[in-house]
Amino acid sequence: VLIGSSLGGFYATQLVAKYGVPAVLINPAMRPWQLFHGLFGGELPYVVNAQWTLDQTQLDQLEQMAVPFVQDADKILVLLQQDDEVLDYREAQRYYSNAAHQSMIMTEANGNHAMDNFADKIPMALQFLSDCIK
């Protein structure tokens, strides 16, 4: 079972594609290599913090990891908020709804990248995951 937010949602998607495990994704990043490049103004390497410096090699690795579609997309619950200040929620809507077995997608008006009122969504997420592993 996986739960991933933003970049963690991108990584979780790769693991669902590879292992078929269920996941809950919170405002997942769709193309993080482009996102990071845009956020940091193309200035690489970028020192994120004392332990992490982002460079072009890492961005290239992220791009190589991307999967064109997820076969087991029905094992994914996607939680999106339209006022995400970092990501365009419509990219995730398109990606996760284009699979043969569509993901369950919940899109809310307003909100933000950190997912407003996430605690209210925990019971639904747990029920979804429980149904997936039965």
Regions found by a protein language model. Give the residues of each.
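Short, conserved beta-strand segments within well-ordered enzyme catalytic domains
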Residues: V1-I3, L25
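Gly/Ala-rich beta-loop-alpha elbow adjacent to hydrolase catalytic centers
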Residues: I3-G8, A12
